[in-house]
């Protein structure tokens, strides 16, 4: 039976943490010291066993770009390669790769199968140890698919390399939903749009007849919840990506906005505003029954649930200015970091205003937007209010969301007054800020789970 695995054998030494050694476990530090240097990695073109050399070359280009985008790897220039006659079935000449100071070498083959599918096999070598690094106990991996699905093969290859070298969960084979913005400011068109994590395959999901905001993926990555002004007032909707079906979620009085799925996908958290007061609600998607989470005269908004489903972080101005609070999902009192017990505990006490909190998939951090001194920041803080770190700074940085492995944050930025919004990402070290290319101006990004 054909194994839907990707033939990949990789081994690398990191110049960051230790000198090359045949006996040491090869790891790349995700959060290295201040003098961090990317690990040199060589990925030659695939050995083509067929006629479609263009597709084979494109697959390698995506793998290289994915890995280089992390800031952890330095892709060696193919023009510098001494050994040209590489084969997945033959051990490489390691001396040739040491000369150009390559720590890791990835060798692969591309095949066109009789049934019309394609297969990609990979082996990856530790240049200094002169040996293969096994993945899940196997010396290689192989993955097959239809030709039109070639980009997913590339992302899965990059995911395998990244995970084996860093020990972190993967995140390349994912999608990003966002708001595509066009037109003048007084007649702005805002549409739901979706793309691969690297910006490829961009498409619109809604026609732009109604303004939409704050899209969020379901845990299955098959549905999106968002706010739409359809019908003249902001309300929360569900959108099925496969069918294109849009559905109003509840018929609350007043307005509903800032939705987000629960971690199990069975409920949606949202804000409901009526008569000048905003509180948090959670709705069961099977029964369509809703339960009120907060009941306070202040403005409570932007709820995000912890990975275990037991807690919710949100923004409230109940202390006089927008700050971050944490509460138990069942509404019971909890012990607060500042001492005492309360239904909702404040976790931000530094200068500035805090908003749009998002709980990390790892459970240890909350990402947020901070406004202070005329500037905006994307930052992270421990769930107990300790260890605040600001990762970005700009005229306007807003709307963070996590990659599924909790190592990268996507957000949108306006670099100066009058500049249109663009999507950016940053890793937890704060040193790898990158702009994500979109066809239009873009805001309100959200990252999907890994695709199945």
Residue ranges and their predicted role:
Residues 169, 181-191, 207-210, 227-236, ...:
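A flexible loop/linker signature enriched in serine peptidases of the S9 family
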């Amino acid at each position: 039976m054909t194994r839907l695995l990707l033939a990949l054998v990789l081994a690398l030494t990191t110049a960051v943490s230790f000198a090359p050694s045949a006996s040491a476990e090869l790891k790349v530090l995700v959060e290295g010291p201040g003098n961090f240097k990317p690990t040199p990695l060589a990925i030659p073109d695939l050995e083509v066993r067929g006629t479609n050399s263009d597709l084979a070359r494109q697959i390698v280009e995506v793998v290289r770009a994915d890995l280089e985008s992390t800031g952890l790897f330095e892709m060696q220039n193919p023009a510098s390669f001494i050994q040209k006659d590489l084969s997945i079935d033959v051990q490489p000449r390691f001396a040739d790769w040491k000369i150009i100071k390559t720590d890791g070498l990835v060798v692969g083959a591309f095949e066109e199968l009789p049934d019309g599918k394609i297969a990609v096999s990979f082996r990856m070598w530790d240049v200094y140890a002169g040996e293969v690094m096994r993945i899940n106990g196997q010396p290689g991996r192989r993955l097959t698919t239809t030709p039109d699905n070639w980009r997913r093969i590339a992302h899965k290859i990059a995911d395998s390399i990244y995970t084996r070298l860093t020990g972190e969960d993967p995140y390349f084979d994912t999608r990003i939903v966002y708001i595509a913005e066009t037109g003048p400011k007084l007649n702005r068109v805002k549409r739901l749009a979706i793309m691969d994590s690297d910006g490829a395959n961009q498409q619109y999901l809604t026609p732009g007849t109604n303004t939409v905001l704050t899209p969020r993926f379901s845990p299955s990555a098959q549905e999106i919840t968002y706010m739409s002004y359809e019908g003249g007032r902001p309300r929360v909707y569900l959108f099925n990506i496969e069918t294109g079906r849009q559905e109003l979620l509840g018929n609350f009085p007043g307005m509903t906005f800032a939705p987000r799925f629960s971690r199990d996908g069975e409920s949606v958290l949202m804000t409901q505003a009526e008569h000048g007061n905003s509180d948090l609600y959670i709705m069961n998607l099977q029964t369509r029954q809703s339960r009120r989470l907060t009941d306070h005269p202040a403005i409570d908004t932007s709820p995000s649930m912890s990975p275990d489903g037991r807690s919710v972080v949100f923004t409230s101005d109940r202390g006089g200015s927008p700050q971050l609070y944490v509460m138990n999902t069942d509404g019971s009192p909890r012990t607060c970091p500042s001492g005492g017990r309360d239904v909702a505990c404040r976790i931000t006490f530094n200068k500035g205003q805090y908003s749009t909190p998002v709980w990390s998939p790892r459970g240890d951090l909350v990402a947020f937007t901070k406004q202070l001194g005329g500037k905006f920041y994307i930052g992270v803080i421990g769930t107990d209010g300790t260890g605040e770190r600001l990762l970005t700074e700009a005229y306007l940085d807003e709307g963070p969301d996590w990659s599924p492995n909790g190592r990268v944050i996507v957000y949108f930025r306006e670099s100066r007054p009058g500049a249109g919004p663009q999507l950016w990402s940053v890793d937890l070290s704060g040193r790898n800020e990158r702009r994500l290319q979109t066809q239009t101006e873009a805001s309100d990004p959200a990252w999907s789970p890994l695709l199945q």
